[in-house]
UniProtKB/Swiss-Prot annotation:
Residues of the DNA-binding region: 33-52
Domain of life: Bacteria
Protein name: Nucleoid occlusion factor SlmA
Recorded GO CC terms: bacterial nucleoid; cytoplasm
Gene name as annotated: slmA
Stretches assigned to coiled coil: 117-145
GO molecular function: DNA-binding transcription factor activity; transcription cis-regulatory region binding
Annotated family: Belongs to the nucleoid occlusion factor SlmA family.
GO biological process: cell division; negative regulation of division septum assembly
Localisation per UniProt entry: Cytoplasm, Nucleoid
The keyword Nucleotide-binding belongs to this UniProt entry's keyword annotation: no
Residue span, HTH tetR-type domain: 10-70
């Protein structure tokens, strides 16, 4: 019984990995059909549906992975790092690095892969970015308490500016067909971004 569950879990992971790889390839710029995905995995469409009731559920699982990966790591940064600017830098670098390491998933983060899918999926990505922006805002609000001095500009404005930088770099990565990596020249870009945090 345990072997059967493990085999099923492995097949589910194989399906999700194939979907992510297809999103990374030139197929990712077009609608991915279950027929193409089944061919990529080497199974029938019926076999896909034994593991996932719909393609939407496959995307849900990938979004869940993105959420878990980013939110868990953000929480670790907040636990380990106490300096506000360092926290913000690490969170931004985390988002950009995650996108760079997972190009197929970056198409999901930018909404590019979801254009042909249910609106609810884009809503989940929107919620994820709202959560991250709220976290950035909270980090900024805690600065006064932690360091005795807050920002002169509104934290809501600053947090949205930081997130817009991340989204822009991820979009550039997708638009360039993954040529311009989000972390390229980060050490030169960060002082420009950090200078806005007043």
């Amino acid at each position: 019984m345990a072997e059967k569950q493990t085999a099923k879990r492995n097949r589910r992971e194989e399906i999700l990995q194939s979907l992510a790889l297809m999103l990374e390839s030139s197929d990712g710029s077009q609608r991915i059909t279950t027929a193409k995905l089944a061919a990529s995995v080497g199974v029938s469409e019926a076999a896909l549906y034994r593991h996932f009731p719909s393609k939407t559920r496959m995307f849900d699982s990938l979004i869940e992975f993105i959420e878990d990966s980013l939110i868990t790591r953000i929480n670790l940064i907040l636990k380990d790092e106490k300096d506000t600017t360092a926290r913000l830098r690490l969170i931004v670098l985390l988002i950009l690095g995650f996108g760079e390491r997972n190009p197929g998933l970056t198409r999901i983060l930018t909404g590019h892969a979801l254009m042909f899918e249910q609106d609810r999926l884009q809503g989940r990505i929107n919620q994820l970015f709202e959560r991250i922006e709220a976290q950035l805002r909270q980090v900024m609000r805690e600065k006064k308490m932690r360091e005795g001095e807050g920002y002169t500009l509104d934290e809501t404005l600053l947090a949205s500016q930081l997130l817009a930088f991340c989204e822009g770099m991820l979009s550039r990565f997708v638009r360039s067909e993954f040529k311009y990596r989000p972390t390229d020249d980060f050490d030169a870009r960060w002082p420009l971004v950090a200078a806005q945090l007043q």
